[in-house]
């Protein structure tokens, strides 16, 4: 009976966290307040929530707009490398929203909008940069694929549908939508199909460029609230696109040859000078980009004129891809480690294994976009087996596993019975 009494008194003296309900024996530290207790785990969780809120909403400057330094600091947490592109984007976005914040204060000088063109190899982070920027500024964001767009009246998507998507992202709040960001991907695919204007209409190339001119510069777009094609009986929402920031991105495959060959005069005969091929990587060649190169590629001068800010992105090397795998907040390695944690298993990668994964992605010429498919292939069998295996504590991935020369190393935890046998 005395034992029961002692256990009852012990349970009364045990303190519990007022938030998660864990006892003082289950946590490292329990902090007492006037009437409540909070454990160290709940404190860490609260700090994580506050940090994420600060990151998602952005740290506002005095005039309500994040400074370029604050924007680039947040970008560094999510995007590896591309320092030049980050600087160009952070300054451009800061100036754009500073212009909107001071628009009503002075009427003497009207500041024009500066849309942005991102040029870089596939998988180098163009789309991700635009998405992260919208999250920092906390404005509605939508992404459109230029390959699906056609001129009005033809089968395909009208350019007005881009504004409709932005309106949907703003929960049909027109005022918020008019300050949003639109990212148009694969803009290189709407280049003119030939150097000279064709007799037949190019409805998915030059025609789309012509259709985009007005909404990029600023116009009142009539948007059908339900989407789809317009009809006379339908009511329209009027959206002013003057203050919407347009960011266009594309890989521009073959543009590097136009840049390298600019100004070259070809000659034949024994006196002809033989020029060595440009051995620079694509990202380095893109740094010398001029508007005339984009015109030769197939963009019309009026379209290029609507994109005064050009940010070129570099190729990702092995070191950059290894950093992308492991360092950002939502890095691929961390994502798969979280998946394995759900099975109470620790996932570990050797450093040389990450380098082999990065080299495979470079060989595929898919940049950072190809990393996930490589990781899936490596971990497929392990993720299939784990839910049915018992006692697995840790899975280790080496370079041989990535190359297909070995299986992942499974480390099992000691069973309770084994421990008792050893102690006996």
Swiss-Prot record:
GO CC annotations, alphabetized: HslUV protease complex
Matches recorded under CDD domains: RecA-like_ClpX
InterPro entries: AAA+_ATPase, ATP-dep_Clp_protease_ClpX, ATPase_AAA_core, Clp_ATPase_C, Clp_protease_ATP-bd_su_ClpX, ClpX_bact, P-loop_NTPase, Znf_CppX_C4
BP terms from Gene Ontology: cell division; proteolysis involved in protein catabolic process
Domain annotation ClpX-type ZB: ranges: 5-58
Keyword tags: ATP-binding, Chaperone, Metal-binding, Nucleotide-binding, Zinc
Presence of the UniProt keyword Chaperone in the record: yes
Keyword ATP-binding assigned: yes
Subunit: Component of the ClpX-ClpP complex. Forms a hexameric ring that, in the presence of ATP, binds to fourteen ClpP subunits assembled into a disk-like structure with a central cavity, resembling the structure of eukaryotic proteasomes.
HAMAP family attached to this UniProt entry: ClpX (MF_00175)
Reported function: ATP-dependent specificity component of the Clp protease. It directs the protease to specific substrates. Can perform chaperone functions in the absence of ClpP.
Protein name: ATP-dependent Clp protease ATP-binding subunit ClpX
Organism expressing this protein natively: Bartonella quintana (strain Toulouse) (Rochalimaea quintana)
């Amino acid at each position: 009976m005395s034992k029961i009494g002692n256990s009852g008194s012990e349970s009364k003296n045990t303190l519990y966290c007022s938030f998660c309900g864990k006892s003082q024996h289950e946590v490292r530290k329990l902090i007492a307040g006037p009437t409540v207790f909070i454990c160290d785990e709940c404190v860490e969780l609260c700090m994580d929530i506050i940090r994420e809120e600060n990151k998602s909403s952005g740290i506002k400057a005095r005039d309500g707009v994040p400074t370029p330094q604050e924007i680039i600091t947040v970008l560094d947490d999510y995007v590896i490398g591309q320092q030049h592109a980050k600087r160009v984007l952070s300054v451009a976005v800061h100036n754009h929203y500073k212009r909107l914040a001071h628009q009503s204060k002075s009427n003497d000088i009207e500041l024009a909008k500066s849309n942005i063109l991102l040029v870089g190899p596939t998988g180098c982070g163009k789309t991700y940069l635009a998405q992260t920027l919208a999250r920092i500024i906390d404005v509605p964001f939508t992404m459109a694929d230029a390959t699906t767009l056609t001129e009005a009246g033809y089968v395909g998507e009208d350019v007005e549908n881009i504004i409709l998507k932005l309106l949907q992202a703003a929960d049909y709040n027109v005022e918020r939508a008019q300050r949003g960001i639109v990212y148009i991907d694969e803009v290189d695919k709407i280049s003119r199909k030939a150097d000279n204007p064709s007799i037949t209409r190019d409805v998915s190339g030059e025609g789309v460029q012509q259709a985009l001119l007005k909404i990029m510069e600023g116009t009142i777009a009539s948007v059908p609230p339900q989407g789809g094609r317009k009809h006379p009986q339908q009511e329209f929402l009027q959206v002013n696109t003057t203050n919407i920031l347009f960011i266009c991105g594309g890989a521009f495959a073959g543009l590097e040859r136009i840049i390298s060959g600019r100004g070259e005069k070809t000659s034949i005969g024994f006196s002809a000078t033989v020029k060595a091929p440009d051995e620079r990587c694509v990202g380095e060649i893109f740094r010398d980009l001029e508007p005339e190169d984009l015109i030769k590629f197939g963009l019309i001068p009026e379209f290029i004129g609507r994109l005064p800010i050009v940010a070129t992105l570099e190729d990702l090397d092995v070191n950059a891809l290894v950093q992308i795998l492991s360092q950002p907040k939502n890095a691929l390695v961390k994502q798969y480690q979280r998946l394995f944690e759900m099975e109470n298993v620790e996932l570990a990668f050797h450093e040389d294994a990450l380098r082999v994964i990065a080299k495979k992605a470079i060989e595929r010429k898919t940049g950072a976009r190809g990393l996930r498919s490589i990781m899936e292939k490596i971990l497929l069998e392990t993720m299939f087996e784990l839910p049915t295996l018992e006692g697995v504590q840790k899975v280790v991935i080496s370079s041989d596993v990535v190359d297909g020369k070995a299986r992942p190393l499974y480390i099992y935890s000691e069973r309770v019975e084994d421990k008792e046998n050893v102690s006996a």
